[in-house]
Amino acid sequence: MVTLYGIKNCDTIKKARRWLEANNIDYRFHDYRVDGLDSELLNDFINELGWEALLNTRGTTWRKLDETTRNKITDAASAAALMTEMPAIIKRPLLCVPGKPMLLGFSDSSYQQFFHEV
């Protein structure tokens, strides 16, 4: 089963969901704010993608952090603690299909290629 992780009010999530629906792809949406984010799942994401890729340093949530907090994010453990506390800081969407590498972010072409290979 395809699982799309993110936050429902994110514009990029909305684009990804529209793309999946337009292409008749069944998926489950996991909203970090509603469904939560346990440490085991987050560690799976970090192990596959790396904490640097998961941490959205271009988003509003990151920009609102004070410099002291931002400077404390230096490794996977500190990044995971912040992402657990503030899931909006995780880059999105994150697409998971069992047996395939995870896909982070959204573009029409990346989704076309990803699902062409499924």
From Swiss-Prot:
CDD domains hit by this protein: ArsC_Yffb
Which N-terminal stretch is annotated as signal sequence? none
Q: Which Gene3D superfamilies match?
A: Glutaredoxin (3.40.30.10)
What name has this protein been given in UniProt? Protein YffB
Q: What Pfam families has UniProt attached to this entry?
A: ArsC (PF03960)
Task: Choose one Gene Ontology CC annotation of this protein and give it.
Answer: cytosol
InterPro entries in alphabetical order: Arsenate_reductase-like, Thioredoxin-like_sf, Tscrpt_reg_Spx/MgsR
Q: Lineage of the native species?
A: Bacteria, Pseudomonadati, Pseudomonadota, Gammaproteobacteria, Enterobacterales
Q: Which gene encodes it?
A: yffB
Family note: Belongs to the ArsC family.
What residues make up the catalytic site?
C10
